[in-house]
């Protein structure tokens, strides 16, 4: 082989190597393209797949197995408001399908899969648990529906007042919903108020001690004489005269002589329990008494204090408000009557308008004891002011707290023109004067003393030295309280104002403020 042939052979070998390299690259590119095409085809097949339908399993309609061991079964399902009988896939065991569970239907409406129970959906309140396990549930508008329990829920204990979520078809209760947080409606506290902190209410305190404290602390004697303690006490009278303080002091006093520790005070504002949704107020009442029973179970004395009771338990059929009282009052009475077996629960109500409370609440056997907490007289006012105006305060020289209290109370209770608030006209057309003393309360007395203390603080800031509380500051405080009370009468409704303040209720037809 000559040199020319060798060069030709080398050139051909080089060309062959290049072609092989290109061929290898083309093979790799073709392989990648094939993989991409396969992936794209799979994606297209997935996108082209028919939609599947969610439904709620109701029951297995039929199920049998042929001679070849193949299952032939159908199921009743609900998709929204639509009920259907559909086949069950042969590879899905019909006996494992549970009522209330979510199932998937393919494009041919065949049950192909069972999912977990849905945890979402409309929330309903349980009104009643039927003997066969079905539930009577209601929505916020009071519309009642009869539903079955899902397989999971059927194993749990359910009672009236519980909340459940229901499926879209409104045929199944799926699961329990945690109760609402109603802690803001019920204030639970251990009060530190004692009867010694309350002035001017000795008679009322003695009566409530006899009615409440004595049965708790002398149970053996009550049993010996076959005497049952009262279920409840109603404190009524004009506002600001110590009804709430008395209730707190009772809860505190009940702990004396017991081994259970301090008493528990559950404070409820009547208007806060009113709810526009039917059944919600009743649920809150049940919740309050349930909590009282829980606290009383360990031996602690429990006071359920319902303030402004007239707003919650109005006389049924009066037309003063909506018909909500027709259901709230019976629910309250049911719970109150149920407290009979509990030795540690006492209901105390407070109201400015006893005339608006349903008579069934006030009858013997329920709120047995009714105590009027009236406006303080001169003697009671002196006892009240002693708690707020003491010798420990910076007082004017050569004068003690007792002397200042006497001057202050005499000024407030003066029956002369400089304390003349207005004239009121009764239903006979007779006019009579109303003085500051006629509308004074324990809260007003405290407010007057606080005004004088505030003046002293401001004066101390201005002068740079502690200002003394004297007759002048107290007189200024009374003048300001008198002026604000008089101005508030300008737009007052005569009948409502007289009822709230206990001045000839129902008879006042006109108010003529002093100019």
UniProtKB/Swiss-Prot annotation:
Write the record's keywords in alphabetical order, separated by commas: ATP-binding, Coiled coil, Nucleotide-binding
| Protein name, UniProt field | AAA ATPase forming ring-shaped complexes
The UniProt entry's GO CC annotations, sorted and at most eight, read:
proteasome complex
The domain of life is Bacteria
Which residues take part in binding ATP? Answer: 240-245
Is Plastid found in the keyword set? no
Q: How does it assemble?
A: Homohexamer. Assembles into a hexameric ring structure.
* GO biological processes: modification-dependent protein catabolic process; proteasomal protein catabolic process
